[in-house]
Amino acid sequence: MATNILTKIFGSRNDRQLKQYRKSVVRINAMEAELEKLSDEALRGKTQEFKDRIAKGESLDALLPEAFAVVREGSKRVMKMRHFDVQLLGGMSLHNGKISEMGTGEGKTLTATMPVYLNALTGKGVHVVTVNDYLANRDAQWMGKLYNFLGLSVGINLPNMAREEKQAAYRADITYGTNNEYGFDYLRDNMVYEGADRVQRGLNYAIVDEVDSILIDEARTPLIISGQAEDQTDLYIAINKVVPLLQRQEGEEDIRTGEGVTKPGDFTVDEKSHQVFLTEQGHESAERILSELGLIPEGATLYDPANITLMHHLYAALRANHLYHRDQHYVVQNGEIVIVDEFTGRLMSGRRWSEGLHQAVEAKEGVAIQPENQTMASITFQNYFRLYGKLAGMTGTADTEAYEFQEIYGLETLVMPPNRPSRRDDQLDRVYKTTREKYEAAIKDIRECYERGQPVLVGTTSIENSEIIAALLDKEKLPHQVLNAKQHAREAEIIAQAGRSKVITIATNMAGRGTDIVLGGNVSKELEAVEADETLTAEQKQQQIDAIQAQWVQEHEKVKALGGLRIIATERHESRRIDNQLRGRSGRQGDPGSSRFYLSLDDSLMRIFAGDRVKAIMDRLKMPDGEAIEAGIVTRSIESAQRKVESRNFDMRKQLLEYDDVANDQRKVIYQQRNEILDAGDLSAQIASLRAGCFDDLVRQYVPVESVEEQWDIATLEKVLADDWQLNLALQQQVSAASAITDHDLLTSVQQEADRVFAAKVEQVGGENFTQFERMVLLQSIDTHWREHLSSLDYLRQGIHLRGYAQKQPKQEYKREAFELFSQLLDAVKNDVTKVLMTVKVQSSEQLEQAAEDMESRGESIANVTYMAPTETGEVETITDDETFRKKSTIPGGNVPRVGRNELCPCGSGKKYKHCHGKLA
């Protein structure tokens, strides 16, 4: 009560904000007469003038009135459309990073041109986000005329475009595209192995059309790119044949005495650390056997750059054969390897060991080797769109979700007044006892409309529902069209004509969205056909245009007199917002219209939430079959049920986000590291830091911090450094010879020797060649471990709710364990990279360059690439497309086939494409 009184005195926040904006509207309108006097050239020149003023430090807010006035004038000349004052208000709210709620037919597409133009003047790019490719294409071409007239470039970002086409689209001042494609481009940019292959150039400002659909309805499903890294099935089988030919060493050599080995062999097994190590003899045996099998050239070593992955496979096969035992660590079930939980003894179906171990066990058991289809990258829309410096959105229905927009995205919702007040009659719901009675009543209403010539739009919540209505209309011999949000371009044409007399259109909620239903139909296509007909003289064209327009006015007035577009719905949606969207299809721009919902107690929403209450009312009133209850109390009780569902869905989305926020913080760290590695000219500081950390960890296992000599295990440390790291240090001799030595002195000795050995390798081939090799090793290690980490997080997430039974807070446990997993990932990258760079044997710069290129090719060759994304209809779409991920550049200015970066350049220079014309692409 008190709130209502205060609102009446001071106005709502919405009113106060609009009052503020109206002052700017007055200023914009005052400039109109002056701008009308300018020539087209002078008006276009304003764009450069604004850019110069921004460069000198003028703010966009200061430029807003002039820029908006210029766009309005440009639109009058190019589009023959003048922005209404309410559209100026909407444009200001979008520029200020808010959500602008504007009713259907209020011209959201035209409204967006003003903030898009203003923000594009900075040169940092503006992204306009739509729900489907058809709308992106339509709006880019439609509004592109205005932007081009004002001297700004426009790009369209569509799926299946080649890499340089996408780069051109993102380089444009304004880019149109779908939410899914922007998100996938962001993920793909963080999977490339060359900085020049990235397509996006920073996320500056985005305007999201149908913002409720994209940021709320589709926000429960993350975008996921999954795929198989290089299929190496044959290699796993071949390496498995090597293992029986290697002998296990019995006993362990004591370095001081040289004794302890009872039977020399090729490898030792350390049960405690669950690791296998090749001996000096083992390296020679393995190299000989691999050479005989044709897996490595004669005379090559396991530590040659090209053979690094073989070493990895060999160790995986040795561990699979000597450390992992059937019916103890795993079972074979239905031709698959199923892991046994070592603590509970339960089978862990669907879980796989990482780093190639699972495939090695499959090769050992002779079952089919499953190529690993891993999640390569994923992100939720909430986290993607929060990356933008400024975000805004527009829709016809946002107010019911204003709290969620504020809570999740920090976006305020402003409701714009209509240009003309709505004359739509939203009638009370009619509730029937059974589905049969409901459909009979709806069909009766449709028939009556058809007979009097009034157009009808029948809204359904599902494709199944629309098919039921279509079948009933067929039975009644009533002509109709069905739209299911599948063929956007065709459906936009059909929905544009849904306002003609006697037309019955059945549509699911999203079908034809973004297209206005004009009473009397849309004649723009017919007018365009006349304009394009070159056989007609100018006079004949004008006559035909006048005739078409006169016919349309007649049809328009006839439909208005019949009551405008009739909306009939056969079910309430879970969300009030979707119901409001359906109603909003009618009564655009002050046109007449009406809407009615026909419901039954069998509808899922009624059954779950409101059925008993309404049924009790019906029973009390002793309602006969075929009679409906039509009362405000029933409509209110249904809306209360919808509020409950909305609240539950909000909680689900919020919970998804809270869990994804954990992964998102880690994703930002990994992606930032990747981008720094791609952009860095010199990686020596990063590599030195990793090396120092790695040897610090290693030495501290045998020489603890601030410990005394009696606690040191120098002999084992010396052996590990020699066997695993190829560092030969006489540490025992150093300790014996020194009168006083600390643990820190030993660590310094090891690190200095590691630095010396590494520096010698770099010097041998030159810093520049080694940097590219370092880059590939780093990227491949980060990518491999990040993908495994995503699988681990997914697995952790699936079972984390069970912690609640142990009186633990699942969310806190997830955060804690995810952090531990991430720390392990960083340690694994540090050790992997250091190990490869320390043990690689470098013969020549050519050999090293070839190894780097092989690693790049392996990293980029992902098979069975699968894209998972939500669709407008609420389903999850899965697209498998190998080509999309690997689209390469073409040389501009000619019909040249696509060329891989490591293939020879088609210009005939004999150089690799990446070192020739690839640099220009």
Curated annotation (Swiss-Prot):
Its main location: membrane. One of its GO terms (biological process) is protein targeting. GO terms for molecular function: ATP binding; metal ion binding; protein-exporting ATPase activity. It is a peripheral membrane protein. The keyword Oxidoreductase does not apply. Zn(2+) binds at residues 905, 907, 916-917. ATP binds at residues 87, 105-109, 516. InterPro entries: Helicase_ATP-bd, Helicase_C-like, P-loop_NTPase, SEC_C_motif, SecA, SecA_CS, SecA_DEAD, SecA_motor_DEAD. HAMAP family: SecA. This is Protein translocase subunit SecA. The gene is secA.
